[in-house]
Structures are given as structure tokens and as C-alpha cells.
From Swiss-Prot:
This is C-8 sterol isomerase erg2. Disruption phenotype: Abolishes the production of ergosterol and leads to the formation of more than one septum in some cells. Leads to susceptibility to cycloheximide and to staurosporine, but does not affect tolerance to nystatin and to amphotericin B. Belongs to the ERG2 family. Keywords: Endoplasmic reticulum, Isomerase, Lipid biosynthesis, Lipid metabolism, Membrane, Steroid biosynthesis, Steroid metabolism, Sterol biosynthesis, Sterol metabolism, Transmembrane, Transmembrane helix. In Aspergillus, the biosynthesis pathway of the sterol precursors leading to the prevalent sterol ergosterol differs from yeast. The ringsystem of lanosterol in S.cerevisiae is firstly demethylised in three enzymatic steps leading to the intermediate zymosterol and secondly a methyl group is added to zymosterol by the sterol 24-C-methyltransferase to form fecosterol. In Aspergillus, lanosterol is firstly transmethylated by the sterol 24-C-methyltransferase leading to the intermediate eburicol and secondly demethylated in three steps to form fecosterol. InterPro entries: ERG2_sigma1_rcpt-like. The chain crosses the membrane at residues 1-21. The gene is erg2. Its EC number is 5.-.-.-. It holds the Pfam family ERG2_Sigma1R. It is an enzyme of class 5 (isomerase). Pathway: Steroid metabolism; ergosterol biosynthesis. It comes from Schizosaccharomyces pombe (strain 972 / ATCC 24843) (Fission yeast).
């Protein structure tokens, strides 16, 4: 009984504290501007709408020009599969820190899954293809096309789809408690696909980017 009373006070207190820090303090660590990312994305889309590789490399160069050493330039050797929420795609980690990550995510063949519930705001800018999304009370899908930015707020959930048989790639920015998002990215690998090689590479690249950020003074 005492434990129950304690938890009914402690859990809301911790939740409120986390929300307060996120709303009024964590934002001070953010370096990436969602509107700027969308602007840069549209510039690359205008040049390479039908060439995924050229589009991603051009956008990577623009991101490096804008954000400098915060960005790891895209290359062919550090792409990894990502299984999360029942969806499967491939990703390249452009930046990772304790308060933000920036990745290329997508698939040449389509996928569908659950967004997850995250202590972060997510900005998903479509670069090629289209994404469909629906919240629990949506009776029609929301459609996002190249240049559109799908904003997924902290704590919300959605079903999403990159339609089967179609390539779809996006620039994804998450801002919030990034470490709290990591289990969502690892659970399928641990308990479903058992793809420990991909898990190792994901942890290796993520930890490396985070360490780089810390050494640069970026939380």
C-alpha cells in the first residue's frame, strides 16, 4: 500500500519534471532548425527529384555547409538496416547527440509500421516517394510528398506507410530525450530479427556520433 501511494506521487512528479526540462531547458541544446532542413531538402529535390543517390549526396553537402562538423557526410559504407515498430528500412546517421539526431531513412521497396511513442518531437521531411500516415482517429490517410514535412509531436502515435513497391526516402530530425528512443530501435533486433550484426553496427555508429558530439560540447 505504501509503495502504491509512493508510486502515484513519484511517477507523475518524474513525468512532470521531464516535461518541464524538455520544454524550458532541453531546447537550449538544439542546433538544428526544422524549417532550414526543409528548405535545404527542397533545394536538393529541385535538382535531383528522380535520382535518390545524387539527391542524398547533394543534401549531405548542403548540411555540411550549414552545420559543419555536426554532420557526418553520407557515404556508402555506414548505411545500416533499421527494424522498429514492425517497419524495416535503411538509415544513415548524419548526427547523433543526447538531445538530437538527424538521419537519412528510407527504403527502395516500401514498408509499414508503428511510429512508436517517444519523448521527442520528430520532423520527417520527404525527399523522394510518398509517406502515408494515420492517427487512431483518422478515417483517411494523410499523404506527404517530396518537400513536405511530417511533424510528429512528443508522445503521439501513428501508423505510417511507405507504399509497397515504391522507393521512399526522408530526412528525419528528432529533438528531445534521444536516449529514451533507443530501445524502440533495438527491440526488433533483439527479440524478432535476431540480427545482432546490424545491432552492433547501429550501436557502434550511434555511440561514435554521440561521443563526437560530446567532445564538441554538444549535448
Amino acid at each position: 500500500m505504501k509503495l502504491t501511494k509512493f508510486l502515484t506521487v513519484f511517477i507523475p512528479f518524474i513525468a512532470g519534471l521531464i516535461y518541464y526540462i524538455q520544454k524550458y531547458h532541453l531546447r537550449s541544446f538544439y542546433q538544428f532548425d526544422p524549417a532550414k532542413l526543409q528548405e535545404l531538402s527542397k533545394q536538393s529535390i529541385a535538382l535531383y527529384a528522380n535520382d535518390t543517390k545524387a539527391l542524398l549526396y547533394d543534401l549531405s553537402d548542403r548540411l555540411v555547409a550549414e552545420y559543419g562538423d555536426l554532420i557526418t557526410p553520407v557515404n556508402q559504407d555506414e548505411w545500416v538496416h533499421n527494424n522498429a515498430g514492425g517497419a524495416m528500412g535503411t538509415m544513415f546517421i548524419l548526427h547523433a547527440s543526447f538531445s538530437e539526431y538527424l538521419i537519412f531513412f528510407g527504403t527502395p521497396i516500401g514498408t509499414e509500421g508503428h511510429s512508436g511513442v517517444h519523448m521527442a518531437d520528430d520532423y520527417f521531411t520527404i525527399l523522394r516517394g510518398r509517406q502515408l500516415a494515420a492517427s487512431a482517429n483518422d478515417l483517411e490517410a494523410r499523404v506527404y510528398l517530396p518537400g513536405d514535412q511530417h511533424v510528429h509531436p512528443w508522445g503521439h502515435t501513428a501508423q505510417y506507410s511507405m507504399p509497397s513497391g515504391e522507393p521512399c526516402f526522408a530526412l528525419e530530425l528528432a529533438q528531445g530525450w534521444i536516449v529514451s528512443m533507443l530501445p524502440f530501435g533495438f527491440m526488433d533486433g533483439l527479440f524478432s530479427t535476431i540480427d545482432f550484426g546490424t545491432l552492433y553496427k547501429t550501436v557502434y555508429f550511434t555511440a561514435g556520433r554521440m561521443l563526437k558530439s560530446v567532445l564538441m560540447g554538444k549535448f
